[in-house]
Amino acid sequence: MIRGRLAPSPTGNIHLGNAWAFMLAWLAARQAGGKVLLRMEDIDPDRARPEYAEGIMADLRWLGLDWDEGPDIGGPCGPYVQSRRVQDYARVLDVLATLGAVYPCYCTRKELRTLAGAPHPGDLGAPYPGTCRNLTIEECSRKEKEGRRPAMRLRWPDGVFAFDDGLFGPQQAGGESCGGDFALRRSDGVFAYQLAVVVDDIAMGVTQVVRGADLLSCTPRQLALYSLLGAQPPAYLHVPLLLDATGERLAKRHQSLEIRALRNAGVPAANITGYLAMLAGMIPDFVPRAPKDCVGLLSTATLPTRPLVTPADILDRLKKGTSR
């Protein structure tokens, strides 16, 4: 059975761009007769807030997106909150250490910026140059006596990792194009997203991942972890991002396009989901449409591959429920 997931980060209220990705993930699972899991990715204690988690669940339900397992209703694979799963991440990190696949990195952020040199294009930043990759036990001990606390990095395996994305087709990358050896745990003990999401998806039996195209470039990193852990990765479908009228990616700073703000402004939920259905090519024109009425209509044949720009008058259009 297909097991898809919605995996919001409770670091703010969800916005129209989040709703776009979540609706497509929900539809992909529902029209395949599958289950939908909700997982709160609150792995970063400096940014995540419980009140945002509650608000996100309320907003998703208001939009008409439900789930079969999650933080509020439980399920066989819980807990469905990353901050309560850190022991699992520690255990898997120990497994990787036993395999010789990780090593301590004592580089400070300032040193990493210096090592990076010129600005590096792409979401993953400059490749890690391997400064700490082959430190001896004595060198590690000396750095720890200096008061340095190590992060833990993956020793990138040889070769490339390939996958067939549901929208963007065949992809492959490895080594420096993936940022080189990447951190699995920060020096302050916080586990990295890449490790947490793979451990969780394996434990929860996730077979289908639908998410924004901004995460396309980090997929080979996750495939490297799947390979080392001997687990089957899910099928991936990356969808284009929504941009504002100036061409910038929608983010949590766009408060006027938060689902909560749209709701408070009197925009009906079906207007929002109908607009998103039109963008996905599920319906020819913008009309109110609930997610449940779109089941069976999602197709990669009609999904755009380029980022989608929302017009400057998007709020007025959403209120009216029409593209005119």
Curated annotation (Swiss-Prot):
Q: What class of enzyme is it?
A: ligase
Record's keyword terms, sorted: Aminoacyl-tRNA synthetase, ATP-binding, Ligase, Metal-binding, Nucleotide-binding, Zinc
Q: Where, by residue number, is the motif 'HIGH' region?
A: 8-18
InterPro entries given in the database record: aa-tRNA-synth_I_CS, Glu-Q_tRNA(Asp)_Synthase, Glu/Gln-tRNA-synth, Glu/Gln-tRNA-synth_Ib_cat-dom, GluQ/Sye, Rossmann-like_a/b/a_fold
Q: Which family does it belong to?
A: Belongs to the class-I aminoacyl-tRNA synthetase family. GluQ subfamily.
Output the PANTHER family linked to this UniProt entry. GLUTAMATE--TRNA LIGASE, GLUTAMYL-Q TRNA(ASP) SYNTHETASE
Instruction: Please state what the protein is called.
Output: Glutamyl-Q tRNA(Asp) synthetase
Biological source species: Nitratidesulfovibrio vulgaris (strain ATCC 29579 / DSM 644 / CCUG 34227 / NCIMB 8303 / VKM B-1760 / Hildenborough)
